[in-house]
């Protein structure tokens, strides 16, 4: 039974064909069925008003086993590495990146906390996962972790759980309806167009610190020009006085970095952008 369009809550249209292909691999998997409580939210963002934090989410999938927050990676080739760094090797080309699971797990914890506030203890458990949509082999130290999804079993793991055993809190139709009603209230919304800051397009979240978030970013005009963008957070209920105070603190840090200039171990300051 095909997974119907009515169960997919779509976000922004993706400009990346590999992202669209990865999502379709999930929806077309033979393990998925057009039955409750199955629901999917693709390309959404999660806004936490109390902190001002914003998290990009590739895919959320609801099944009887809970809510799965899935980070999608579509690099081709053979995956090697450990719990810290991953390397994809394909026809002589190598690409190394930080293991994306900790970032996905952080988002899952934020979502779980927001769900707890909206639904109390009667909420689905939130699992973090990483889906490698284009990998040919996995050779990680210690073997394949249970949260790592591959094209051959992505559907079965989302439907049946990572280990195939029933979760302690099974999601029924009533819980599904509560979640659908609460989705907008808890800050889950379709992603806007690509976020731009000072001519740079924000990418992966790499640091989630006290009062700020940092993203990798690419120059929209010169793709090889890459940077890290630090965004200082302003909670939704912040007064004008407190907002001005936070703005001054951000400017002070920018001035300090500008005065340091080039220094080993410290990224060089480029610009301060008001948002």
PLM-predicted stretches and their roles:
Residues 268-275:
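Short beta-strand micro-motifs within the conserved protein kinase catalytic domain, predominantly
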Residues 54-55, 210-211, 275:
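Short, flexible loop/turn motifs enriched in small residues
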């Amino acid at each position: 039974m095909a997974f119907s369009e009515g169960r997919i809550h779509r976000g922004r249209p993706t400009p990346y064909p590999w992202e669209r292909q990865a999502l379709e691999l999930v929806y077309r998997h033979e393990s998925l069925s057009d039955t409750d409580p199955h629901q999917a939210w693709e390309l959404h963002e999660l806004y936490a008003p109390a902190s001002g934090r914003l998290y990009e989410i590739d895919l959320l999938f609801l099944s009887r086993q809970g809510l799965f927050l899935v980070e999608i990676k579509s690099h081709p080739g053979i995956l090697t590495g450990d719990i810290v760094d991953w390397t994809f090797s394909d026809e002589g080309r190598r690409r190394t990146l930080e293991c994306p699971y900790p970032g996905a797990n952080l988002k899952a914890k934020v979502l779980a906390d927001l769900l707890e506030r909206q639904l109390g203890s009667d909420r689905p458990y939130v699992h973090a996962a990483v889906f490698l949509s284009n990998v040919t082999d996995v050779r990680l130290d210690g073997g394949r972790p249970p949260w790592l999804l591959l094209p051959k079993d992505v559907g079965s793991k989302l439907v049946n759980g990572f280990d195939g055993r029933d979760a302690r809190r099974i999601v029924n139709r009533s819980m599904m309806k509560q979640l659908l009603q609460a989705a907008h209230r808890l800050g889950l919304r379709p992603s806007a167009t690509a976020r731009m800051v000072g001519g740079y397009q924000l990418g992966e979240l790499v640091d989630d610190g006290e009062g700020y978030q940092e993203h990798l970013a690419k120059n929209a005009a010169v793709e090889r020009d890459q940077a890290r963008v630090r965004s200082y957070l302003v909670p939704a209920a912040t007064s004008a006085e407190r907002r001005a105070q936070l703005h001054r603190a951000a400017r002070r840090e920018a001035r300090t970095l500008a005065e340091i200039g080039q220094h080993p171990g410290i990224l060089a300051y480029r610009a301060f952008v008001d948002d």
